[in-house]
Design a protein with these regions (language model features):
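Extended substrate/RNA-proximal surfaces in nucleic-acid metabolism proteins
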Residues: 1-50
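Charged catalytic cores and adjacent phosphate/nucleic-acid-binding surfaces used
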Residues: 31-141
Length: 141
């Protein structure tokens, strides 16, 4: 079903295999310059149970709209570096720089423990010396 003209078949196959599916690059400039937008396809994926998380930070890019969607829709926050070459070409560790990463608050050190934490949204995103909140915040009115 992965070699199919209907992209939903890939999501159905991934879900059937128990995959943890998350949306990468919600604020990708090449796709939607200067805004982070929730498209109809994302509603379809979310409503169908095909999306468990969203990447709220990628490299030095942070997508506050994506973080709010995670809070509103009870999705897991993910952060990635998206580095496609040796890390030291982008990160200067001697200056205290670090890659963007997902902190997973697992109850045990195992694959199952990590998956359980992801499923229950026990993550935080470490990006540019800040950590996104791992739990809901009250919005200011």
């Amino acid at each position: 079903p992965l070699d199919s003209p209907d992209y939903m078949n890939a999501f159905k196959a991934a879900k059937a295999q128990g995959a943890f599916i998350f949306w990468n690059h919600p604020g990708w400039d090449a796709q939607q310059p200067e805004e982070t937008k929730w498209w109809d396809v994302h509603t379809q994926l979310y409503d169908g149970g095909y999306m468990q998380g969203i990447e709220v930070a990628n490299g030095s890019s942070y997508f506050p709209e994506a973080q709010q969607w995670c809070l509103d829709k009870k999705l897991t926050m993910i952060g990635n570096s998206d580095i496609h070459q040796p890390i030291q070409t982008d990160i200067d560790f001697s200056k205290g720089e670090h890659r963007t990463m997902t902190l997973v608050f697992a109850k045990e050190r195992s694959t199952e423990g990590i998956r359980e934490a992801l499923n229950n949204r026990r993550t935080a995103v470490f990006v540019t010396r800040a950590i996104s909140p791992p739990r809901e915040r009250k919005r200011e009115s």
